[in-house]
């Protein structure tokens, strides 16, 4: 509270000549409240506009108590020269003060909240609102001061890491939450200044040796940021400057980080803004890194649906995290580094966003530049996985790789070898684009080897990997030409050896085999017939071809000559009058072909994708339910047959059941027909 803050949190003995209103209030409580900037005089810069200074009712109440106690504790004038009496009186007052402090502390926050008198709190707030009706910031400060004064428990560490994320607000009763939220709604325009007041007051209390517990201010901060997280995220630059100004005081830095981090537990986007703007810049500081990583872990654990955080992390944020996670001998301890490694895959998903097929090529250059032969093994594995993902998901990554290839030969050799090892797991579409890219790399390697540019060893390694990849891409193919030639040579050699060893074809094994199988006689007969028919055909052509040829030439020649003349005239006319139109038509046709080549594959792919979705819809919506219904019907029929046949299904039983079913169907059809006829006759008779 303001009065308690001004008084240092203790009752003090006021000497006779001292004015009781010197603690920050005027006479009778009518003075002005100190401005927030004055109360927070520790800061060397003005972060927010000053709040209008005025006293609060709660301060006045404390000042009246202090005045009454001071009047009782100030000795009378006649006894003033007696110093021993003054010392005894001072010791008694100090003892009473310590007892009052001890009585004001509870063993736990649960006990303090149970002992809190909500009626008294509401009464004080009503008084504050009636007296300071035009100053909502006073109401809020009274609320925070009252809660913090009443909720005095043994101090805890600044980040409350042993408690749930919403502690201490999670312990607040429903009635107290209603009071707090109602007052925050009434003073909605002063919430930003109230947040600054709570934060700065907490930091001031940390400067005091027997400082108070700060649960009242913590509860107010959590209540504000549950509904208004942008109070923090719109002023991250201001709070980062504040954090850096207290870098030598870890307790204050952790308190600031805890307070700002409360904005992220209800909204993943705001939480990532706080972490990237406040905690990432201090990652690596020994006293602050554990809380920063623990907060990120808790934030991602509370928001498993990462889609709301897409677009928050960019390349400038992801790659410092990659270096922190995988580079050895950095400012993080091994345990924190391992924890960050476990969080990195989810951070990568957040960075790639909702459309990785159009964004991954922007990450490819940084991934490739880090994949050096000397980088740590775990980092190398992660980089190669990320590079492969870029090539498989974003088609533009291959063109980016082509541009970077001549200046990143050592990194490209590692990636090529990794692609060779994992070629079978790469989709066919990606394999095709990679094959074209590797073919261009092969030409680049030949040019570099011929010119002697770059490191020859890197070029040789890349060239070898490219050749292996191209061979792997083509796959294993049988040399059919060589196999046929080999079979032909083997057959000719076998026949020659067979004929030579048996002196004749009839005596050879081949001849005997062909004779016994009937192939040789059939072949001889076929050859005889072919020969005779060929002779007959030749003789017929020899007789008829000259006569028919001369007759055909006589009939067709005039028409052909006339057509040739008309064709020459038409071509001459077109060449003389339509040359420009023909050129335009040729250009248009070429453009049309080019457009079809570029757009038709996408259209066909879209058509095939739509057809696939239609077939899947038909399968899931019609075919699969129909199939299940058919199976259920067959199961019911089988069960009915078992019941009708008393467990033993025979053909006679099946015939009986089928005849009964047919008879029942026929009767139902007759009944339906008779009913329809009766209805029709009734309708006709009515008309």
UniProtKB/Swiss-Prot annotation:
Q: Where in the cell is it found?
A: Endoplasmic reticulum membrane
Region of interest: Disordered: 1-36, 68-94
Gene Ontology terms: cellular component: cytoplasmic microtubule; endoplasmic reticulum; endoplasmic reticulum membrane; Golgi apparatus
GO BP: apoptotic process
Kindly report the protein's main subcellular placement as a broad class. endoplasmic reticulum
- Matches recorded under InterPro entries: TMEM214
The record lists the membrane-crossing segments as 475-495, 614-634
Q: Where is the composition biased (Gly residues)?
A: 1-10, 20-29
Membrane topology according to the record:
Multi-pass membrane protein
The residues that carry sugar chains are 267, 305
Q: Which UniProt keywords apply?
A: Acetylation, Apoptosis, Endoplasmic reticulum, Glycoprotein, Membrane, Transmembrane, Transmembrane helix
Where are the N-acetylalanine modifications?
Answer: 2
Tree of life domain: Eukaryota
Family per record: Belongs to the TMEM214 family.
Q: What does the subunit comment say?
A: Constitutively interacts with CASP4; required for the localization of procaspase 4 to the ER.
The record's function comment reads:
Critical mediator, in cooperation with CASP4, of endoplasmic reticulum-stress induced apoptosis. Required or the activation of CASP4 following endoplasmic reticulum stress.
Q: Report the protein name in the record.
A: Transmembrane protein 214
The source organism is Bos taurus
């Amino acid at each position: 509270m303001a009065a308690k803050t001004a008084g240092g949190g203790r009752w003090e003995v006021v000497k006779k000549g001292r004015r009781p209103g010197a603690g920050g209030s005027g006479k009778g409580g009518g003075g002005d409240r100190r401005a927030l900037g004055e109360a927070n005089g520790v800061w060397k810069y003005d972060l927010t506009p000053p709040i209008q200074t005025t006293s609060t009712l709660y301060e006045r109440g404390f000042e009246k108590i202090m005045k009454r106690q001071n009047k009782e504790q100030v000795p009378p004038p006649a006894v003033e020269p007696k110093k021993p009496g003054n010392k005894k009186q001072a010791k008694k007052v100090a003892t009473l003060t310590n007892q009052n402090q001890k009585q004001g502390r509870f063993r736990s926050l649960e006990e303090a909240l149970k002992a809190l008198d909500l009626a008294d709190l509401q009464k004080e707030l009503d008084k504050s609102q009636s007296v300071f009706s035009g100053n909502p910031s006073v109401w809020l400060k009274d609320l925070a001061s009252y809660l913090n004064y009443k909720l005095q428990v043994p101090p805890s560490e600044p980040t409350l890491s042993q408690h749930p994320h919403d502690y201490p607000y999670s312990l607040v009763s429903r009635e107290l939450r209603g009071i707090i939220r109602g007052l925050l709604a009434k003073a909605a325009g002063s919430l930003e200044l109230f947040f600054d007041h709570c934060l700065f007051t907490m930091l001031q209390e940390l400067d005091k040796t027997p400082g108070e517990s700060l649960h009242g201010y913590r509860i107010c901060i959590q209540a504000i940021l549950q509904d208004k997280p942008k109070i923090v995220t719109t002023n991250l630059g201001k709070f980062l400057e504040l954090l850096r100004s207290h870098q030598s005081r870890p307790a204050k830095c952790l308190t600031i980080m805890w307070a700002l981090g409360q904005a992220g537990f209800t909204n993943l986007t705001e939480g990532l803004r706080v972490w990237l703007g406040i905690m990432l810049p201090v990652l690596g500081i020994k006293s602050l890194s554990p809380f920063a990583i623990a907060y990120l872990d808790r934030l991602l654990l509370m928001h498993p649906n990462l889609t709301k955080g897409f677009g928050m992390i960019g390349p400038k944020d992801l790659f410092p995290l990659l270096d922190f996670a995988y580079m050895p001998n950095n400012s993080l301890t091994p345990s924190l580094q391992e924890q960050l490694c476990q969080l990195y895959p989810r951070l990568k998903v957040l960075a790639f966003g909702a459309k990785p097929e159009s964004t991954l090529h922007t990450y490819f250059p940084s991934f490739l530049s880090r994949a050096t032969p000397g980088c740590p093994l775990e980092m190398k594995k992660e980089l190669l996985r990320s590079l492969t993902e870029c090539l498989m998901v974003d088609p533009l990554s291959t063109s980016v790789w082509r541009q970077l290839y001549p200046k990143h030969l050592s990194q490209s050799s590692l990636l090529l070898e990794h692609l060779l090892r994992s070629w079978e797991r790469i989709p066919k579409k990606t394999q095709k684009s990679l094959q074209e890219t590797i073919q261009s790399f092969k030409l680049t390697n030949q040019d570099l080897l011929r010119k002697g540019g770059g490191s020859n060893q890197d070029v040789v390694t890349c060239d070898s990997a490219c050749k292996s990849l191209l061979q792997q891409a083509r796959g294993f193919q049988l040399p059919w030409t060589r196999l046929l030639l080999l079979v032909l040579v083997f057959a000719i050699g076998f026949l020659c050896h067979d004929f030579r060893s048996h002196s004749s074809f009839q005596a050879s094994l081949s001849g005997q085999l062909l004779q016994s199988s009937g192939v040789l006689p059939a072949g001889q007969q076929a050859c005889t017939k072919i020969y005779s028919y060929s002779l007959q055909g030749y003789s017929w052509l020899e007789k008829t071809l000259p006569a028919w040829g001369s007759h055909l030439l006589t009939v067709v020649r005039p028409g052909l000559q006339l057509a040739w003349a008309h064709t020459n005239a038409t071509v001459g006319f077109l060449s003389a009058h339509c040359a420009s139109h023909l050129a335009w038509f040729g250009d248009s046709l070429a453009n049309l072909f080019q457009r079809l080549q570029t757009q038709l594959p996408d259209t066909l792919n879209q058509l095939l994708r739509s057809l696939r979705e239609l077939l899947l819809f038909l399968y899931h919506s019609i075919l699969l339910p129909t199939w299940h219904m058919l199976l259920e019907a067959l199961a019911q029929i089988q069960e009915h047959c078992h019941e009708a046949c008393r467990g033993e299904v025979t053909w006679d039983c099946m015939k009986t059941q089928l005849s009964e079913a047919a008879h029942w169907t026929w009767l139902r059809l007759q009944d339906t027909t008779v009913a329809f006829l009766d209805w029709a006759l009734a309708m006709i008779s009515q008309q």
